[in-house]
Amino acid sequence: MKTLSWRVSEVDESAVALLASRTGLRPLTARILLSRGHGAPEQITRFFAPRLGELRPPTGMADIERALDRLIRAIHDRETIGVFGDYDVDGVTSAAVLTVAMRALGATVVPRVASRADGYGLTVAMVDALAGQSCRVIVTGDCGTSDFAALGRARERGIDVVVIDHHQVPTGPRMAYALINPHQSEDAFPFKGLASCGIAFYLMAALRSRLGIASFDPREMLDLVALGTIADLVPLLDENRILVAAGLRVLTARRRPGLRALIEVAQLTDEAIAADQVGFRLTPRLNAAGRLGDAQLALDLLLAPDDLQARALAGQLDEV
């Protein structure tokens, strides 16, 4: 068995003492925070008590305005919008965020997720299937950046594809109608660690703002964003930390039938849902659908309209 050696970061002990005295933290906690680059009291406040009001606006996200213009046109012209997510939890929750929001904002949406048997990402066959359901726009979640064959097929069929993704951007032609990916060179948003569900949340919040529909509150979707962000193991810093902290509060309220049923089958009885419970009890069940069964089951659960349907789907999911 390989022996691992720990490398402990060296920290100025006088800085540890000063930070502990200024914040009331224990010296060990102050040392850990300093080793992670959190030295100012205001940084520590944001770390321990992140607030939604501290989310930076999507200014600088490449192609977000182009994506918004196309989605608004689709809603106004009553075009059918296809939503397609990858089969992991980030992809499924991205698809759920997009579907919930756009339906609430007046769109006709056909939601689909990838099948592991068909491989990762948007496929030519899926483009054809969504075209067969009269989709004129496709919005992807957690895939699409490098799916050149499928993007080419969509272009041939006159379908505009809005890609929401956070995977690395390969060299090659940009074939999507709009690409919202923090790793493209044109993107100027300061935080590059968002999961796709977080990017989807930003896009939908901006869409609601542009349409001026006050009856829909994007914050209601933060339970989904917390699930996808935690499951994808992205750094819980900056925007991710804010979204997850707020999302755990929404999840604890248990307002979504599908997640209420999932919490029941996971036998979580604590009043408050914590990040470790999401990571070890909830998201593995959702992931199992995509890895061992059909990820559409997980998406259907998240979109379930009532407790009766949600409990039936959660029971099926728990047996996968």
Describe each PLM feature range.
Residues 11, 86-87, 114-117, 143-144, ...:
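Short, ordered loop/turn segments at secondary-structure junctions
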Residues 137, 141-160:
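Phosphate/diphosphate-binding loops
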Residues 2, 9-13, 18-134, 157, ...:
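Hydrophobic helix-and-loop "lid/oligomerization" segment in the mid-to-C-terminal part
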Residues 83, 139, 162-163, 229:
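Residue-level marker for buried hydrophobic side chains located in beta-strands
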Residues 97, 174-213, 218-230:
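Short alpha-helices
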Residues 132, 145-149, 169-173:
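Catalytic core of soluble alpha/beta enzymes
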Residues 97-105, 156-161, 170, 176-183:
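A glycine- and small-aliphatic-rich helix-loop capping segment at beta-alpha/alpha-beta transitions
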Residues 139, 166, 173-174, 195:
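Phosphate/pyrophosphate-binding betaalpha-module
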